[in-house]
């Protein structure tokens, strides 16, 4: 099966040349890293947290994530863990077979790694339907395609985002990466506070990010509950923290935080975006 793009023409440009220009705009934007990265080969990064809104809003912050990832070396496989915004599919859904199409080309699914993740998990289902209309994995793929077509993906979407579920997903991903010997990194797809005034969003997100940089997934859940936070991808973030820790990561840094208000100038109701790795 080839999964067709669901949000081309909405979250990002449908025309390939225009999409490449938009990606360059994201990197060169004043809220972005300022330059396009050179492809490196160190391959130290185990996990990345990046936003998934429309490129005109969160693209510059996402560009920070991909500047660091590309500079470190593009992994052979990216396990992209995202929240389920549509309600379609099962509680945790993985697409195992086929490829994903974007305006920049087609990316194969790493079926062997996908199968290993499902085998290691007690909760992940093989389910294509959860991915068909979901934007929060799709928007990451063109950023890597801009630099290479030599990579594969494993898309995982989480409707169930409780801590036990995230722990299962994180352990399964890390165990499968080790079992298969893959050169892989994990991407957690999330936006932070939704539709609050800028000062409230920043204060709320700061508390959550403090726990993420400490790699304290338990504490992150506590803060989210305490503040009734509207972060949409807390389960993918927790799963990525857990997987990265198992794979040897010992630290996590905040590289960029901004809001939609920093782009549009309207700070009365914003969405928070962050890049951490």
From Swiss-Prot:
Signal peptide: none annotated. Gene3D superfamilies: LigB-like. InterPro entries: MEMO1_fam. CDD domains: MEMO_like. SUPFAM superfamilies: LigB-like. Belongs to the MEMO1 family. This is MEMO1 family protein MTH_45. It comes from Methanothermobacter thermautotrophicus (strain ATCC 29096 / DSM 1053 / JCM 10044 / NBRC 100330 / Delta H).
């Amino acid at each position: 099966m080839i999964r067709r793009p669901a949000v081309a023409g909405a979250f990002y440009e449908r025309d390939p040349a225009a999409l490449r220009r938009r990606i360059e705009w994201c990197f060169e934007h004043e809220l972005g890293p300022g330059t396009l990265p050179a492809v490196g080969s160190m391959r130290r990064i185990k996990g990345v947290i990046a936003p998934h809104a429309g490129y005109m809003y969160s693209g510059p912050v996402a560009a920070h994530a991909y500047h660091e990832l590309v500079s470190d070396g593009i992994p052979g496989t990216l396990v992209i863990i995202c929240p389920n915004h549509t309600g379609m599919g099962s509680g945790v859904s993985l697409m195992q077979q086929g490829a994903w199409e974007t305006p920049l080309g087609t990316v194969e699914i790493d079926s062997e790694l996908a199968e290993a993740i499902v085998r290691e998990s007690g909760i992940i289902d093989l389910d294509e339907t959860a991915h068909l209309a979901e934007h929060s994995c799709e928007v990451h793929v063109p950023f890597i395609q801009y630099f290479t077509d030599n990579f594969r993906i494993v898309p995982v979407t989480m409707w169930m985002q409780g801590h036990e579920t995230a722990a299962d997903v994180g352990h399964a991903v890390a165990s499968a990466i080790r079992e298969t010997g893959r050169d892989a990194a994990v991407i957690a797809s999330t936006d932070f506070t939704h539709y609050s005034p800028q000062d409230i969003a920043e204060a709320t997100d700061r508390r959550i990010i403090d726990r993420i940089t400490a790699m304290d997934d338990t504490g992150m859940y506590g803060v989210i509950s305490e503040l009734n936070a509207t972060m949409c991808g807390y389960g993918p973030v927790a799963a990525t923290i857990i997987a990265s820790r198992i794979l040897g990561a010992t630290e996590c840094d905040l590289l960029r935080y901004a809001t939609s208000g920093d782009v549009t100038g309207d700070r009365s109701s914003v969405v928070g975006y962050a890049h951490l790795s």
